[in-house]
UniProtKB/Swiss-Prot annotation:
Pfam families, sorted: NanE
Record protein name field: Putative N-acetylmannosamine-6-phosphate 2-epimerase
Recorded GO CC terms: cytosol
GO molecular function: N-acylglucosamine-6-phosphate 2-epimerase activity
Biological processes per GO annotation: carbohydrate metabolic process; N-acetylmannosamine catabolic process; N-acetylneuraminate catabolic process
Documented EC number(s): 5.1.3.9
SUPFAM superfamilies for the chain: Ribulose-phoshate binding barrel
Organism ancestry: Bacteria, Pseudomonadati, Pseudomonadota, Gammaproteobacteria, Pasteurellales
Catalytic activity: an N-acyl-D-glucosamine 6-phosphate = an N-acyl-D-mannosamine 6-phosphate
Annotated function: Converts N-acetylmannosamine-6-phosphate (ManNAc-6-P) to N-acetylglucosamine-6-phosphate (GlcNAc-6-P).
Length: 228
């Protein structure tokens, strides 16, 4: 898409659905051409934006869609629990591949690059910055640093058992604090996604329920088995 202003990108995704096209790692659908096809199908279905993991996947998708793309890189590091876009080089590569928004881990956990440097680099590359946070304190800190979007992405994923329900309270609190809020994390039905907007989210990201076929099939298979 042509380079839009920050406000134009936010306007395009506001009150809309973001499709996170991230297949199961090393699964049969974990191929750039398939990710691109999923992204194009998502746009045809009415998505306002996309979340794409990996530079190769982003490069394969960008020429075929006109909606804003949130780009991330996931890494498993030996010395940090932070996985989402941990390095400045990741930010540069995503921007050069065509991301409009770049998301990074916004938690307070130990990280290889300080978050202040990350948001600065994202803006230097001409992209909007999104922080994937786990609680209100992190979200407020990231907002103060200049992040354009604050997501509830990491709520429930920084230790302990993962809750079944989305973190509605975090979405409400972030919105009350004046953040542009991305509801993300366990919004796996149309009804839950609708609630996210109703309680104040500016937009909502859905992933597994849309693009991870292995997960979707397992939900149905397990439900059928439980009937016997």
């Amino acid at each position: 898409m042509s380079k839009l202003s920050y406000q134009e990108v936010l306007s395009q995704i506001q009150y809309g659905l973001i499709s996170s096209c991230q297949p199961v790692d090393d699964g049969p659908m974990d191929k750039p051409e398939i990710v691109s096809a999923m992204a194009q199908a998502s746009v045809m279905g009415g998505r306002s934006g996309l979340r794409i993991e990996g530079v190769d996947n982003l490069k394969a998708t960008r020429p075929f869609v006109n909606v804003p793309i949130i780009g991330i890189v996931k890494r498993d590091l030996p010395d940090s629990p932070v996985r989402i876009t941990p390095f400045l080089q990741d930010i540069e590569d995503l921007a050069n591949a065509g991301a409009d928004i770049i998301a990074v881990d916004g938690t307070s956990r130990p990280r290889p690059v300080d978050i202040e440097s990350a948001v600065k680099k994202i803006h230097e590359m001409g992209c909007l910055a999104m922080a994937d946070c786990s609680n209100l304190e992190e979200g407020l800190y990231c907002k103060a640093l200049g992040f354009d979007i604050v997501g509830s992405t990491m709520s429930g994923y920084t230790g302990g058992a993962v809750p079944e329900e989305p973190d509605y309270q975090l979405v409400k609190d972030l919105k009350s604090a004046g953040c542009f809020v991305m509801a993300e994390g366990r919004y796996n039905t149309p009804e839950l996604a609708k609630v996210a907007i109703e309680i104040g989210a500016d937009c909502v990201t859905v992933g597994s329920a849309l693009t991870r076929l292995e997960h979707i099939v397992s939900w149905f298979a397990n439900s059928v088995k439980s009937a016997r």
